[in-house]
Structure formats: structure tokens, C-alpha cells
Amino acid sequence: MTDPIIIAIDGHSSCGKSTMAKDLARAIGYIYVDTGAMYRAVTLYSIRRGLWKDGVLDTETLRNEMSDVRITFRLNAETGLPETYLNGENVEQDIRSMEVSAKVSPIATLDFVREAMVREQQAMGKSKGIVMDGRDIGTTVFPEAEMKIFVTALPHVRAQRRLDELRAKGDATTTFDDVLANIEERDRIDSTRAVSPLRQAEDALVLDNSHMTIPQQKAWLLERFQEVTGS
């Protein structure tokens, strides 16, 4: 058996990072961590605490309350997948709402939020054998990761994928244009923020999955993993 490694999968929102990271982790017996879910959980906390007034976040109150935000992952025995818990409550479905999607990028630009999340993520990866997806895993969280993937896809393809997810969860009101606008705005914020902006690591392999099926993506990732580990 080869020594365990760290696999960093970065890329734009709604490009299928989480799906491929979960599939890869399950196939190779690694732990999967959805870092985007961590930022979404902080966002959900801020919404529930009423920290948004007329679209503006009370950042100082959130800063002071960050020590009260406890995010953990627990394995769902039925699905075999990790689910997100906020202060002991399963919020896996709640963090996927459009309201959270609309506010998560501004939350993720806050230095004190990113610093707290990065510390947690680095602690999770100390023993390696982990697949972590996000925006800055290969550049900030684990710049020494042995395998780095940068995922992208056309905006309209990503919007349709996200809309399909929302429809499957019972959202019948959000439109394609709503989702596309949200994705384009998140791209802008993620790419221009001062702290850990979304960018491709110099040594990352690029995967444009605009026209790939999930099985094709999984096969591609497994091939790259075998190349890196020599397995």
C-alpha cells in the first residue's frame, strides 16, 4: 500500500467539485472534507442570528461570536457520506438553500472567518489520506498537497446543474437566471477577494468538466491518483 497523500480539489462554484471529491474519496478509502460546507455553515449561523440588516452583515458581532460556531462532520450510515453539523444540529440541507448561496461569498471574504476555517481544515489533514475540496485548498490550506486539481466548467452548464439540484430538493421557484446571476457574482467575489482568492495553483492539473459525465470525471481522477501514487 502506498503512503497516504493529500488531494486538493479547487475550482469555481457549482462545477461538481464536491460530487467528484466524494466519489474519489470513497473509491480510494480516503476521508472527504467539504470545505465549502464549512463556510455555508457559518453563513447559516449569521442568518439565523439575524446578523444581516438590509443586505449588510454585522461583521463585528460575527467576529465576536466565531468561538460559538462549532462545525463538525458526521458520517451518514445509510448514504456512507459525511453530513454537516452546526453546533450539534444536522444542517446538511439547510446550508444548500439559495439564501445561503447568495450570502456565502461575502462571508468567505472575511479574514477572521477564513483564518478560523483554514486552521480547522489543516488540523483535519494532519494525518493525510484526505480529499478536500474548496477554493483555496491547493494554494493556502495545503500548498504542499501531493495532488492538486483545479476544476472549471462553463457558467451556463454550472447554472443548470445547480438548478437541477434545487429542483430535486423541492425548490420550484428559483429560476435559471437567478442561479446564473448568483454563480457569476460568486465567481467575481471569489476571484477578487483580498484573502485567499480563487486561483489555480501553479502545479495543479486542470479539469474542464463542462461536457463530462460523472463516471468520466471519476475515471479521470482515479487515473491521476494512480499516476501520482504509482499504485
Swiss-Prot record:
- Report the transmembrane regions from the record: none
Q: What EC number(s) does the entry state?
A: 2.7.4.25
List cellular component terms (GO): cytosol
Q: Name one GO biological process term.
A: pyrimidine nucleotide metabolic process
Q: Which CDD domains match?
A: CMPK (cd02020)
Highest taxon, organism lineage: Bacteria
Alphabetically, the GO molecular function entries are:
ATP binding; CMP kinase activity; dCMP kinase activity
Q: Which UniProt keywords apply?
A: ATP-binding, Cytoplasm, Kinase, Nucleotide-binding, Transferase
- Family matches, as NCBIfam families: cmk (TIGR00017)
- Which PANTHER family does UniProt cross-reference here? CYTIDYLATE KINASE, CYTIDYLATE KINASE/PANTOATE-BETA-ALANINE LIGASE
This chain's protein is named: Cytidylate kinase
Organism name = Porphyromonas gingivalis (strain ATCC BAA-308 / W83)
Q: Which gene encodes it?
A: cmk
